[in-house]
Amino acid sequence: MDNQLDVPLGILKLPVPLKEDYNRRQKLIELIEKPLWTITGKCAKNTLIPDLVSICKVNDQHQFIIFDAKYYNAHLEKGIVPTGQPGIESITKQYLYQLAYQQFIEDHNFSSVKNCFLLPTENNEIEDKGEVRMEMLSNLGLQDIKIRLIPATMAYDLYLSGSKMDMERLDL
């Protein structure tokens, strides 16, 4: 998936040159704010950590893509109440990842932002299972979360061969 969380900002292939306000050696993961505990005047050690962030060019458009891999056996079929799907905490956290990177995304003129849950499937093809949306967060300009089921055998093969998936296959 070409995870770029631990890549220094100065190396990333951005739509425009890195803005001067950013440290070229700082990593993408380090842009996420840590909680400040006001009584101590100190920040906590931990913060939000997305599974994967990819910066790629698809159809001449620079995309900032935030992935969260889930190991659920979700049943998502038209007209049927969903079961086995990621919970509210996973959904809100995925929206927060975008919010955490929003300034960086705006500063560097990305064409689009994509949020996506990746779930396994025993089938042989990538499956588009729509999106999950929370209107109050969509109304803030955050992107709804796309759902893609990835064949488990494909994921294993890519991992074992050290290969990266072509993002266009996900049709985000």
Residues covered by each model-derived region:
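Catalytic core segments in nucleotide and nucleic-acid processing enzymes
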Residues: M1-L172
